[in-house]
Amino acid sequence: MSNLRTLVFFATPPHDCSYLPDREATTMFVDPRAHIDKKLYSQLTALGFRRSGSHYYRPHCESCNACVPVRLQVGQFEPDRNQRRVLRKNADLDCKLVPAAFSERYYRLYAHYIEERHRDGDMYPPSREQFTSFLVEGATDSWFLEMSLDGELVGLAAVDLLDDGLSAIYTVFAPELEHRSLGTFAVLWQIEEAKRRELPHLYLGYWIKECRKMNYKTRFQPIEALRDGHWREMSTD
């Protein structure tokens, strides 16, 4: 059984940064041969690691610390006016958690989302193998939040259950329903689910000040950032 003291880590060679142009990044990975159970996964997440399929990673850049792990203190969260509007707008959705697994209807929504929203990114073109390796493989206590409208799947959020919270992995939605703000709605739903389970945190991954697509994370308050090995409430001024 692996534990933090026995884990082996590997660093990648420098590669193009996925978030900031004209920068190089280095990524630290946990040895993929290690057995990661829920307890160890929770400990790694609290240390700033994220899961992508069966891989656990953290930025390890020599000259840049722009990627900041953040988590929401769900017990102190109160939705603002815009977030309350999103909740009202999506009150007609049927939402349920199901075990993370491959299905064609999940993949169709995923592929549609990637093709319409991320054609210029490294996830294009989508494939069934990509979906499975990213969202299904390596799952420890992993779930999909189904969001359906009149029986049709319109949103899917991958979420992991940890010892001290939930970890929001990835969300896709029908691009033609962008006006519903389903990404925001998925986070709000996960906040309420963490509260229901009496878990203190929702881990939101990395916040990058200079990356516009990461800015949404600071709309959820109070948010904590992991800096210098300690979680502290983050000022967004």
Curated annotation (Swiss-Prot):
Its top-level enzyme class, in one word, is transferase
Tell me if Transferase is a UniProt keyword of this record: yes
Q: Which SUPFAM superfamilies match?
A: Acyl-CoA N-acyltransferases (Nat) (SSF55729)
Q: What is its EC number?
A: 2.3.2.29
State the Pfam families in the record.
Answer: ATE_C (PF04377), ATE_N (PF04376)
Homology family: Belongs to the R-transferase family. Bpt subfamily.
NCBIfam families assigned to the protein according to its UniProt record, in alphabetical order: PRK01305.1-1, PRK01305.1-3, PRK01305.2-2, PRK01305.2-3
> What is the name of the protein in this document?
Aspartate/glutamate leucyltransferase
| The species this protein was found in | Marinobacter nauticus (strain ATCC 700491 / DSM 11845 / VT8) (Marinobacter aquaeolei)
* Gene designation: bpt
